[in-house]
Amino acid sequence: MTLPLLGPMTLSGFAHSWFFLFLLVVAGLIAIYVVLQLARQKRMLRFANMELLESVAPQRPSRYRHIPAMLLALSLVLFTVAMAGPTHDVRIPRNRAVVMLVIDVSQSMRATDVEPNRMVAAQEAAKQFADELTPGINLGLIAYAGTATVLVSPTTNREATKAALDKLQFADRTATGEAIFTALQAIATVGAVIGGGDTPPPARIVLFSDGKETMPTNPDNPKGAYTAARTAKDQGVPISTISFGTPYGFVEINDQRQPVPVDDETMKKVAQLSGGNSYNAATLAELNSVYVSLQQQIGYETIRGDASMGWLRLGALVLVAAALAALLINRRLPT
């Protein structure tokens, strides 16, 4: 929970929970206050002449006189929570990660069911994704059809990726499995040289395609897409798949209309086997939306951050309120 002016306030993930022992001190102070109030009442009742007492103190103490003490005790409780060091989830930009953008450039990408065609729309959306991805992430690019080619090794130079995207060319057949294996090899290579940690950097493959794998025809083949997806999971590299297009796409090949419907099921299976997520998009706007979602997932990591300042600020406000209440109600600070 985040409150205006106060900041994040949680009651979980305490870094120094032993500070809650201070609540015993607060409880002791409350007990002393109650005992003093009872003793005060007993002293007042010792007056033998009640009429004289009422003439001397005609106004009975206000029932609100305990509010300052209550606020003071509450402020001590709030300060105790702050000292215990609560934490909350904080999203911070990644500065050590690898993302391989793997794009299908097979002939089916000529289909115009997405204006102006699937390839051009894919290029524009991918360039926007590259621009908006967290600057510290190493982004690589692979184009694949019958074979897979690393066009850009993972780098933080976004201009190199965008320039390569502009040069994508169509080719025959679709070897999705080979593309995934090639991406895994590129990730392993760059992971061996990237410093900044005792373990390889986190990595992800973003696979963009519109149709079924044709080389090999069986995705469970040793070089098939499903086999590659299982290998990716074993290496801790999830695959986010994007199936792009509509069921009504077609291309003209040798003056014949060839249907090229989008294949969502294969892409979903690849994502599932790798431990990643699958997306589908039928328009450029939907594709951009998918890339924005991926950018939020890939570009940031969640860590536990300090949430004590909110409790400190609230405790200070309550303490000030206790002092003001004492001056207004009892005409003195609480004792």
Swiss-Prot record:
Gene3D superfamilies assigned to the protein according to its UniProt record, in alphabetical order: von Willebrand factor, type A domain
Location in the cell: Cell membrane
Segments traversing the membrane: 18-38, 67-87, 309-329
Membrane topology field: Multi-pass membrane protein
Domain of life: Bacteria
Keyword Secreted recorded: no
Keywords associated with the record: Cell membrane, Membrane, Transmembrane, Transmembrane helix
Domain VWFA: from-to ranges: 98-298
One term under GO cellular component: plasma membrane
SUPFAM superfamilies: vWA-like
Similarity comment: Belongs to the UPF0353 family.
Identification of the protein by name: UPF0353 protein MUL_1490
Organism: Mycobacterium ulcerans (strain Agy99)
Lineage: Bacteria, Bacillati, Actinomycetota, Actinomycetes, Mycobacteriales
